[in-house]
Protein backbone atom coordinates (compact mmCIF):
# COMPACT_ATOMS: atom_id res chain seq x y z
CA UNK A 1 0.00 0.00 0.00
CA UNK A 2 1.45 3.38 -0.96
CA UNK A 3 2.27 5.80 1.80
CA UNK A 4 0.54 8.65 -0.07
CA UNK A 5 -2.29 7.25 -2.19
CA UNK A 6 -3.10 10.49 -3.98
CA UNK A 7 -1.54 11.45 -7.28
CA UNK A 8 -0.88 15.00 -8.36
CA UNK A 9 -2.85 16.05 -11.38
CA UNK A 10 -1.05 16.44 -14.69
CA UNK A 11 -1.93 20.14 -14.60
CA UNK A 12 -0.14 20.46 -11.26
CA UNK A 13 2.96 18.69 -12.57
CA UNK A 14 2.99 20.77 -15.76
CA UNK A 15 2.39 23.96 -13.80
CA UNK A 16 5.50 23.35 -11.73
CA UNK A 17 7.57 22.90 -14.90
CA UNK A 18 6.06 26.03 -16.43
CA UNK A 19 6.66 28.12 -13.32
CA UNK A 20 10.31 27.03 -13.28
CA UNK A 21 10.70 28.07 -16.93
CA UNK A 22 8.89 31.39 -16.36
CA UNK A 23 11.10 32.14 -13.37
CA UNK A 24 14.26 31.39 -15.34
CA UNK A 25 13.12 33.53 -18.29
CA UNK A 26 12.26 36.42 -15.98
CA UNK A 27 15.74 36.33 -14.44
CA UNK A 28 17.71 36.70 -17.67
CA UNK A 29 20.64 38.98 -16.96
CA UNK A 30 19.99 40.87 -20.23
CA UNK A 31 16.78 42.26 -18.71
CA UNK A 32 18.59 44.07 -15.91
CA UNK A 33 21.19 46.80 -15.75
CA UNK A 34 21.79 50.43 -16.59
CA UNK A 35 18.90 51.74 -18.68
CA UNK A 36 17.05 48.46 -18.33
CA UNK A 37 14.81 46.95 -15.65
CA UNK A 38 15.88 47.86 -12.12
CA UNK A 39 17.31 44.86 -10.27
CA UNK A 40 15.05 45.40 -7.27
CA UNK A 41 12.13 43.53 -5.73
CA UNK A 42 9.75 45.66 -7.83
CA UNK A 43 11.80 45.10 -10.98
CA UNK A 44 11.85 41.35 -10.38
CA UNK A 45 8.08 41.38 -9.86
CA UNK A 46 7.65 43.22 -13.16
CA UNK A 47 9.72 40.70 -15.12
CA UNK A 48 7.85 37.82 -13.45
CA UNK A 49 4.55 39.53 -14.26
CA UNK A 50 5.55 39.96 -17.91
CA UNK A 51 6.61 36.34 -18.33
CA UNK A 52 3.66 35.04 -16.29
CA UNK A 53 1.34 37.07 -18.51
CA UNK A 54 2.99 35.67 -21.65
CA UNK A 55 2.44 32.14 -20.33
CA UNK A 56 -1.22 32.80 -19.50
CA UNK A 57 -1.85 34.47 -22.85
CA UNK A 58 -0.59 31.30 -24.54
CA UNK A 59 -2.55 28.98 -22.24
CA UNK A 60 -5.77 30.96 -22.73
CA UNK A 61 -5.49 30.41 -26.49
CA UNK A 62 -6.54 26.79 -25.92
CA UNK A 63 -9.63 26.41 -23.72
CA UNK A 64 -8.73 22.79 -22.89
CA UNK A 65 -5.66 24.14 -21.07
CA UNK A 66 -7.89 25.84 -18.49
CA UNK A 67 -6.87 23.50 -15.64
CA UNK A 68 -3.18 24.16 -16.39
CA UNK A 69 -3.81 27.92 -16.54
CA UNK A 70 -5.52 27.76 -13.13
CA UNK A 71 -2.80 25.59 -11.59
CA UNK A 72 -0.12 27.93 -12.98
CA UNK A 73 -1.92 31.00 -11.60
CA UNK A 74 -2.21 29.36 -8.18
CA UNK A 75 1.47 28.38 -8.18
CA UNK A 76 2.51 31.82 -9.46
CA UNK A 77 0.78 33.57 -6.57
CA UNK A 78 2.07 31.04 -4.04
CA UNK A 79 5.57 31.90 -5.26
CA UNK A 80 4.90 35.62 -4.82
CA UNK A 81 3.50 34.99 -1.33
CA UNK A 82 6.57 32.97 -0.42
CA UNK A 83 8.85 35.71 -1.77
CA UNK A 84 7.15 38.34 0.39
CA UNK A 85 7.55 36.18 3.47
CA UNK A 86 11.23 35.54 2.67
CA UNK A 87 11.75 39.30 2.37
CA UNK A 88 10.46 39.68 5.92
CA UNK A 89 6.95 40.97 5.27
CA UNK A 90 4.93 40.20 8.38
CA UNK A 91 2.17 37.61 8.35
CA UNK A 92 -0.49 40.24 8.99
CA UNK A 93 0.71 42.39 6.06
CA UNK A 94 1.04 39.61 3.48
CA UNK A 95 -2.66 39.40 2.52
CA UNK A 96 -2.87 43.15 1.85
CA UNK A 97 0.35 43.06 -0.20
CA UNK A 98 -0.86 40.00 -2.12
CA UNK A 99 -4.11 41.78 -2.94
CA UNK A 100 -2.13 44.70 -4.37
CA UNK A 101 0.17 42.36 -6.33
CA UNK A 102 -2.79 40.42 -7.73
CA UNK A 103 -4.51 43.62 -8.80
CA UNK A 104 -1.29 44.86 -10.42
CA UNK A 105 -0.70 41.53 -12.16
CA UNK A 106 -4.20 41.26 -13.62
CA UNK A 107 -4.08 44.87 -14.81
CA UNK A 108 -0.81 44.14 -16.58
CA UNK A 109 -2.15 40.87 -17.99
CA UNK A 110 -5.13 42.69 -19.51
CA UNK A 111 -2.97 45.47 -21.00
CA UNK A 112 -0.32 43.10 -22.35
CA UNK A 113 -2.89 40.64 -23.75
CA UNK A 114 -4.77 43.40 -25.58
CA UNK A 115 -1.59 44.81 -27.13
CA UNK A 116 -0.16 41.39 -28.02
CA UNK A 117 -3.49 40.22 -29.45
CA UNK A 118 -3.58 43.31 -31.68
CA UNK A 119 0.16 43.00 -32.41
CA UNK A 120 0.37 46.63 -31.37
CA UNK A 121 4.04 47.23 -30.60
CA UNK A 122 3.47 50.88 -29.62
CA UNK A 123 0.70 50.10 -27.11
CA UNK A 124 2.75 47.27 -25.63
CA UNK A 125 5.85 49.48 -25.39
CA UNK A 126 3.79 52.17 -23.63
CA UNK A 127 2.36 49.63 -21.15
CA UNK A 128 5.79 48.11 -20.50
CA UNK A 129 7.33 51.55 -20.14
CA UNK A 130 4.66 52.61 -17.67
CA UNK A 131 4.65 49.38 -15.64
CA UNK A 132 8.11 47.89 -15.89
CA UNK A 133 10.29 50.93 -16.51
CA UNK A 134 8.09 53.44 -14.62
CA UNK A 135 8.49 55.76 -17.63
CA UNK A 136 6.40 55.47 -20.82
CA UNK A 137 9.18 57.19 -22.77
CA UNK A 138 11.84 54.72 -21.61
CA UNK A 139 14.36 53.87 -24.31
CA UNK A 140 14.31 50.21 -23.21
CA UNK A 141 10.51 49.80 -23.45
CA UNK A 142 10.45 49.29 -27.26
CA UNK A 143 13.19 46.65 -26.93
CA UNK A 144 11.18 44.91 -24.23
CA UNK A 145 8.06 45.15 -26.39
CA UNK A 146 9.84 43.62 -29.38
CA UNK A 147 11.06 40.83 -27.10
CA UNK A 148 7.58 40.14 -25.68
CA UNK A 149 6.00 40.05 -29.14
CA UNK A 150 8.76 37.72 -30.36
CA UNK A 151 8.23 35.39 -27.39
CA UNK A 152 4.45 35.40 -27.89
CA UNK A 153 4.84 34.59 -31.60
CA UNK A 154 7.40 31.87 -30.82
CA UNK A 155 5.07 30.27 -28.28
CA UNK A 156 2.05 30.56 -30.56
CA UNK A 157 3.81 28.46 -33.19
CA UNK A 158 4.51 25.60 -30.80
CA UNK A 159 2.56 23.35 -28.48
CA UNK A 160 2.00 24.83 -25.03
CA UNK A 161 4.27 22.15 -23.55
CA UNK A 162 7.21 23.85 -25.29
CA UNK A 163 6.95 26.57 -22.63
CA UNK A 164 7.99 24.03 -20.00
CA UNK A 165 11.60 24.20 -21.21
CA UNK A 166 14.09 27.04 -21.67
CA UNK A 167 13.77 26.63 -25.46
CA UNK A 168 10.18 27.84 -25.14
CA UNK A 169 11.46 31.21 -23.95
CA UNK A 170 13.75 32.89 -26.50
CA UNK A 171 16.37 35.07 -24.86
CA UNK A 172 16.35 38.83 -24.96
CA UNK A 173 18.99 39.99 -27.40
CA UNK A 174 21.34 42.15 -25.31
Predicted regions located by residue number:
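Surface/interface-facing alpha-helical segments and adjacent flexible terminal/loop regions used
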Residues: 1-174
Amino acid sequence: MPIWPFRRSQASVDSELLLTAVTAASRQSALFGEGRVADTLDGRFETMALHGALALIRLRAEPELGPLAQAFTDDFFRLLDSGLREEGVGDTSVPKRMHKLASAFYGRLDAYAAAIGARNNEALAAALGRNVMKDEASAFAPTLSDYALRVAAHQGERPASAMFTPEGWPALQA
